Regions:
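Membrane-embedded alpha-helical bundles of multi-pass transporters/translocases
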Residues: 1-229
Length: 229
């Protein structure tokens, strides 16, 4: 009985505090922005990937085999990047280079998909998105909280991970439905690709602004970022 009464109240309080922490802190707001842009792009890339598979394989069993093999490869790529690439990139180019790696690679892969649509280019685009999201992007994003007060980190991460991710993923799905409703069938893939490029442009811009904000914090306030106007 005690848990049924206390846990919902704590969850509501945490959600409110997390949102207030993000909105009141420019640094945390930028962290939330890059995390949410990542989730906004995911359903767009996923739709194009699954559409390419459906076009290539008419047999359900063949699709299942391909998807199973693909995700095994993508998991291996993510592990290899985390072990071999992420430490080197962070050491020589810094955290922001790690944050920029995913949107830049998604841009390149999407351009390849626009130039040559098909299952191979769609697979490369999927790996550029989720393969880097599960490895270098996540590792880079976690290091951003080092300069933040632990309580603010707890509140902000709770909101970003539990609410922000889901909200923007749903919003991304809504964008797909909008494209499907208003674009000719032959242009859906291209329109989704161009929309992906547009979101990545805002994503990269947010990373650049975040880098400047991080430098400003380090120069003006070496202490944890409790309150950034």
């Amino acid at each position: 009985a005690m848990f049924r009464e206390v846990v919902p109240e704590q969850a509501i309080k945490l959600q409110g505090e997390g949102l207030r922490a993000v909105l009141a802190n420019r640094y945390l707001l930028l962290i939330a922005a890059i995390a949410c842009f990542s989730q906004l792009v995911e359903p767009l890339v996923e739709y194009q990937f699954l559409s390419a598979i459906a076009e290539r394989f008419s047999d359900t069993e063949a699709r299942s085999r391909f998807i199973g093999s693909f995700f095994s490869v993508m998991g291996g790529v993510a592990i290899a990047i985390n072990v071999l690439v992420t430490p080197v990139l962070h050491r020589y180019l810094g955290t922001l280079a790690g944050l920029a790696a995913q949107p830049l690679n998604v841009v390149l892969a999407t351009c390849g998909f626009v130039a040559q649509p098909g299952i191979m280019s769609a697979s490369v685009m999927k790996i550029a998105d989720r393969g880097l999201s599960y490895s270098i992007n996540r590792a880079s994003r976690e290091t951003l909280y080092i300069n933040v007060d632990p309580l603010l980190t707890y509140q902000a991460k709770a909101w970003i991970d539990m609410f922000g991710y889901r909200t923007f993923k749903v919003f991304g799905s809504g964008l797909i439905l909008t494209i499907l409703a208003f674009s000719p069938a032959a242009r859906v893939g291209y329109d989704l690709a161009w929309l992906t490029l547009l979101i990545c442009a805002f994503w990269i811009a947010a990373v650049v602004v975040l880098g400047r904000e991080q430098q400003r914090l380090l120069l003006r306030n070496p202490r944890p970022a409790n309150a950034v106007p």
